[in-house]
Amino acid sequence: MKKPQFTQDQIYHIYNRGVEKRKIFLDKQDYLRFIHNLFTLNNENIITNNSYDFSNKLNKNESKSRKLLVEILAFTLMPNHFHLLLRQKENNGIVKFMQKLGTGYSMYFNQKNKRVGGLFQGRFKAVIIDNDAHFWHIPTYIHLNPLSLINYRGSTSINYKQKIEFLKQYKWSSFLDYIGEKNFPSVISKDFLLDVFQGEKNYMKITADWIKNDSKYLQKINDITLK
């Protein structure tokens, strides 16, 4: 995949997975650590925090002195990979942020699990969101990733209401924040997308429509799935 040029205020779909498709999140603490890093390392003034110990709580007061490298518009963490929707705010902001995020989490994970070596499958992948099809469907695609954990595609035994309930129970994404249920509100910047999707209730309707017409929408973004 050709690497895009990162430019100011442009939106990108960023993703990566564990080396050899290994799990990169083994327990609740791992998910919380990565999300904690999404917040604390999104700062021009902060270097990578490699400490094993950290607070699970995100201090809202810290945001007052932050100089954001990127806006985190949406995210989903899966057992062996992650998806981020980022808008660059500082020169070279995405590269700086992803370097700090990857290094910081890898060192935490290796220290915790007494392992050595790379954790991720090479450099992060990036796709520029530069057309309407991507722009309208990528946020929901990112948020619906957890449904693959229940093997929902092609299944006739699980209806769309059950799938939505599953998404509401899955904490490790920004989906809940977009439907009006606070989960990790300090991490994301949601006003832009909520304006595009005309509010929380309408985004919920869009999500339900996505689930009902999964194969149709997947065809529109089949060039950005993990390979």
What are these regions, as identified by a protein language model?
Residues 1-173, 178-183, 196-227:
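Short catalytic/metal-binding and nucleic-acid-binding patches
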